[in-house]
Design a protein with these regions (language model features):
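Aromatic- and kink-enriched transmembrane "portal" helix at the membrane-lumen/periplasm boundary
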Residues: 39, 67, 71-74, 88-95, ...
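Extracytoplasmic catalytic/substrate-binding loops of multi-pass membrane glycan-assembly enzymes
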Residues: 36-55, 64-89, 230-240, 436-445
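Membrane-embedded, lumen/periplasm-facing catalytic core of multi-pass transferases
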Residues: 55-58, 110, 247-249, 416-470
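Extracytoplasmic
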Residues: 443-504, 508-533
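Hydrophobic/aromatic-rich transmembrane helices and adjacent perimembrane loops
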Residues: 59, 142-145, 179-180, 185-188, ...
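Transmembrane-helix signature of polytopic, membrane-embedded enzymes
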Residues: 106-132, 147-148, 161-166
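Signature aromatic-anchored transmembrane alpha helix within multi-pass, membrane-resident enzymes
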Residues: 25-28, 121, 164-171, 191-192, ...
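Membrane-lumen/periplasm interface segments of specific transmembrane helices
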Residues: 209-313
Length: 551
């Protein structure tokens, strides 16, 4: 490739870069990704909850604009719906796209910021088949992190002005905050840094024209959606997050016999009387919050070690899974080696110093997820935000360890062929699916939804403890949720009539609902549903899940 073209694609002549290698790496990871997701739609079941709400609100975007559930992620689904209109197919399409998109963006980010081609593509391949990439749910963090990395790549390749780089990053994180609301904190911090940098080291007037389109779009977004929503179904989102994970930790440490999907509401009202927001809990029960944070630190360290292991080792290539424990041990030893090696500490310090603006941006970006993990719980989708900074630090350290060794492209291609040969299918992974507490190997909710799609000629109301179940059905179904809609002061029969329920999805989780098990009208209904005009349809022979319906 002519030197002029390389210079056009890459501003820093001091570090080796090849546009050809960049494109080659993207193509190789994409090919591996296509092999990974082959026969995907036949092997992967659907799940519900948060992801289905994002999807449905995206499908309805512009006809019905919702500001309370990730509107910028809704827009992503709207774009994908140009290719698939069926909810099931759209859900699976998004799943496939983000599985491949994230490792491609991570590889490109590492390579254009000076990491060697071999280390960059190794990490890209490793993340592609990792449980961090494939099993993390919901998928919203994949999209947010991918676009953040993409903007960093654009900044490195085509935008020379640091002020303009910061302006573009501010815009990106502002839009991302309407997918993950906690990122509004990152936006405000980065905005302050951007204004400080421009006013102190640059001339604001030079960048007004560049910034105007982004500012106009931000104003439009704010005018339509206001601030990112802090509530869900009228309940403070922070309160929901804290109380759900308080219940989960209660189950883990106290062997509590609770259903985390339903009982958290009753437990929270009993444990935190008079509290309706997370702020109320902080004010009235500060020691509970502090104790929870110390517990979360331990879980967060485990999450960091798990992600570092996924970055370093493509374990899924091996036929046995217990070797991952060796990986955890190796990561711990690797971290200790870096901490105790003066040379490696110095190398890392020099790398941070030479990329101080990048590290500052990465830290600002990851800060809200760190806070959320420590205050609420370190869920895997918070861990996705750690990928850019952890991958970059690990890549720098490995590059320094192998400095002076040049790995030829031929070896990379040989390893790629070996990787493709040994690569697992998606069937190896326990992909997200609906949890009903049933031992049911044949359970596939795609079949349930496809059957319900045959009955969309008139409106129906379905009672279940599956959040957003009806949103996966094509049309004319609405939910009466056992988790959020059920009124404990009324009997089941009163509510069934009031809400005109004509479908009931019965699962083992619903059977274990302590509220319903004490309700005589529910017990009578389940004993003899035919007396109320309901018929039973059992989809699976090996579990308790079945459907009750009125014709």
């Amino acid at each position: 490739m002519p030197l002029e073209l390389q210079t056009f694609f890459y501003k820093d002549k001091l570090k080796p870069f090849s546009c050809t290698n960049l494109l080659l790496g993207i193509i190789l990871i994409a090919l591996a990704g296509f092999r990974l997701i082959r026969n995907f739609n036949n092997l992967v079941d659907i799940s519900f909850d948060d992801e289905v709400q994002y999807m449905r609100y995206g499908m309805e975007l512009f006809h019905n604009i919702r500001s309370d559930w990730g509107p910028s992620y809704n827009l992503w689904y709207k774009l994908l719906s140009l290719f698939e209109q069926s909810p099931i197919e759209l859900y699976l399409l998004n799943y496939k796209v983000v599985i491949i998109l994230l490792p491609i963006c991570l590889f490109a980010f590492l390579y254009v910021y000076g990491i060697s081609f071999f280390i960059s593509i190794w990490i890209g391949f490793s993340i592609l088949i990792s449980t961090t990439n494939i099993l993390t749910y919901p998928r919203i963090s994949h999209v947010v992190v991918s676009f953040f990395l993409l903007v960093l790549v654009v900044n490195r390749l085509w935008i020379k002005s640091k002020s303009r780089q910061l302006i573009l990053l501010c815009f990106t994180i502002f839009v991302a905050a309407f997918a993950r609301p906690e990122l509004m904190l990152a936006f405000l911090i980065l905005l302050a840094i951007t204004l400080f940098y421009i006013l102190k080291f640059d001339d604001l007037k030079k960048h007004i024209v560049f910034a105007l389109p982004f500012v106009a779009i931000m104003i439009l977004i704010f005018a339509v959606f206001r601030l990112p929503s802090d509530s869900f179904k009228g309940i403070d989102r922070a309160y929901i997050a804290f109380c759900q994970h308080y219940t989960i930790k209660n189950i883990i440490f106290n062997k509590g016999h609770f259903n985390q999907f339903i009982d958290w509401i009753a437990i929270s009202k009993a444990q935190f009387p008079g509290c309706t927001t997370f702020t109320d809990i902080v004010i009235n029960f500060p020691l509970v919050v502090i104790k929870g944070m110390f517990i979360n630190i331990g879980f967060y360290l485990q999450l960091i070690i798990s992600i570092c292991t996924d970055i370093l080792f493509p374990f899924q290539l091996l036929p046995f899974n217990k070797i991952v424990l060796l990986g955890y041990g190796f990561v711990v030893l690797f971290i200790l080696f870096i901490l105790f090696s003066k040379k490696q500490r110095l190398n890392l310090f020099n790398a941070i110093n030479s990329n101080k603006y990048l590290f500052l941006v990465l830290l600002v970006f990851v800060l809200p997820s760190v806070i959320s993990s420590l205050v609420f719980f370190p869920r895997m989708h918070y861990g996705i935000f750690l990928l850019p900074i952890l991958s970059f630090v690990i890549a720098i350290l490995i590059d320094n360890l192998v400095k002076g060794y040049k790995i030829r492209i031929g070896l990379v291609l040989f390893l790629f062929a070996l990787f493709m040969y040994k690569m697992p299918t998606i069937k190896k992974y326990n992909t997200p699916r609906l949890l009903t507490n049933d031992e049911c190997p044949t359970q596939s909710y795609k079949e349930v939804i496809k059957d319900l799609n045959q009955h969309t000629d008139k409106p129906h109301v379905i009672f279940s403890n599956v959040l957003s179940f009806s949103l996966m059905i094509d049309k004319n179904f609405t939910d009466f949720s056992a988790e959020y809609d059920y009124d404990n002061s009324k009997t089941f029969m009163e509510q069934m009539k009031a809400h005109q329920v004509d479908y009931v999805l019965q699962t083992k989780f619903l059977t274990e609902d302590r509220r319903l098990s004490k309700d005589s009208t529910w017990l009578q209904f389940m004993t003899n549903p035919q007396a109320y005009g309901f018929k039973k349809k059992k989809y699976f022979d090996d579990c308790e899940t079945y459907l009750l319906y009125k014709e």
